[in-house]
């Protein structure tokens, strides 16, 4: 799994970033950390070929066209996301920038032979904050299943109280320093809310599952959690998030 380390402050928001890339001539479509047939038979090679090879690729190509020669040219992907979200008054580059980030993150959430149950501190926090691993699964699956239309469901670590500076219709604030389940419409991700460190996501746009599951989104969600999630990746992100919070 690629490193998700690093700390960047954009408009007062601290969050995990990937080291590079910038949106410039060197910004290219990043492949998943496994072959396109590596998730079979759970997720088909055909799904990866269309989802990564066409949808994700198009987001990258469109983003490069949108930012070249603008004030966003040369900024990091995360800076572009927060700036172009524009407190909910979304600017043209936002959707493609956020979808590039979301998909890079999503591919790293999965691995061949994934699923099962996490261990260590991650499991302890899940049991503390949700009551049990089963209750967490129920809440995450419900968030993903009930996201109307296109969007994403997330497990995130909330590091501080929500300040509302850069989001329209935010999730309700609650106590700090805990795991939370969120859902977001279209391309929106927790980076724009401030104080949320994404740990896990599932893509519930129809193109993510329709070739394999048709309209059976709940079945796709269950298979994702049971057979695809890389809990090692989620645990690593939790460790890095807590280290960043401590050093901020």
Curated annotation (Swiss-Prot):
Keyword presence, Kinase: no
Keywords: Chloroplast, Iron, Metal-binding, Oxidoreductase, Plastid, Transit peptide
Entry-linked Pfam families: Sod_Fe_C, Sod_Fe_N
EC class name: oxidoreductase
GO cellular component, one term: chloroplast nucleoid
Catalytic activity: 2 superoxide + 2 H(+) = H2O2 + O2
Cofactors that this protein relies on: Fe cation
Chain segment of the transit peptide: 1-24
E.C. numbers: 1.15.1.1
Xref: Gene3D superfamilies: Fe,Mn superoxide dismutase (SOD) domain, Iron/manganese superoxide dismutase, C-terminal domain
Main location (coarse class): plastid
Cofactor binding comment, as recorded: Binds 1 Fe cation per subunit.
Binding site for Fe cation: 51, 103, 203, 207
Subcellular location: Plastid, Chloroplast
Keyword Nucleotide-binding annotated: no
InterPro entries: Mn/Fe_SOD (IPR001189), Mn/Fe_SOD_BS (IPR019833), Mn/Fe_SOD_C (IPR019832), Mn/Fe_SOD_N (IPR019831), Mn/Fe_SOD_N_sf (IPR036324), SOD_C_sf (IPR036314)
Gene Ontology molecular function: metal ion binding; superoxide dismutase activity
Family that this chain belongs to: Belongs to the iron/manganese superoxide dismutase family.
Role, per record: Destroys superoxide anion radicals which are normally produced within the cells and which are toxic to biological systems.
Subunit record text: Homodimer.
Protein name listed in UniProt: Superoxide dismutase [Fe], chloroplastic
Organism: Glycine max (Soybean)
